[in-house]
Amino acid sequence: HVQRNKTKHLAEKFAWVHGVDRLIIAERLSSQRLDSAEPLNICLQVNIDGQDSKDGCAPEEVATLVEQISQLPRLRLRGLMVIPAPNNLKAFADAQALFEQVKEHHAHPDDWDTLSMGMSGDLEAAVAAGSTMVRVGTALFGARDYQK
C-alpha cells in the first residue's frame, strides 16, 4: 500500500512499486516520474480474499483500474500483487484467474506479465498457481523479531 506522501520519493528513486491500489496513487506516480527516466514498473495491489487487515483494491475494481492506469504516461502496469490470508491456497487460483481476465482491459497487453504472489511459507503453491514473482524475505533473513 502506497501512501500519497510517499509517491514523489518512489517516482524518483525506484524502478518497481508493488503497492498501487488506487487511481490517485498511480496518477501521482505518473506525474512525478521524470520524463528522462525509464517508465516506472507497477503492480496493482489486490485484496484478493477481502481481509480487513490488508490493503488493496477489491477484485471487482481491477478491470477498471487496469484500463485507467495502463493509459498513464511514464508508468508500465505490469500486473497484480496479492498477499492472501495464510493457508488460503484458493486465493492463488483466484488471483491467477483475475490476472488472465483483466488482461484484455490493458492498453498495452504485452506489458501484462507479472503476478506477484507467494511468500517464503507458501511459495511452492503460489508458483504452481502461476506466480511469476515471490517474496522470500523470511527464507533469506529469518523471521522478524516483533519484540524489538
PLM features: what roles do these ranges have?
Residues 1-121, 127-129, 141-143:
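Conserved alpha/beta-domain cores
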Residues 131-148:
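Gly/Pro- and small hydrophobic-enriched strand-loop and loop-to-helix capping segments
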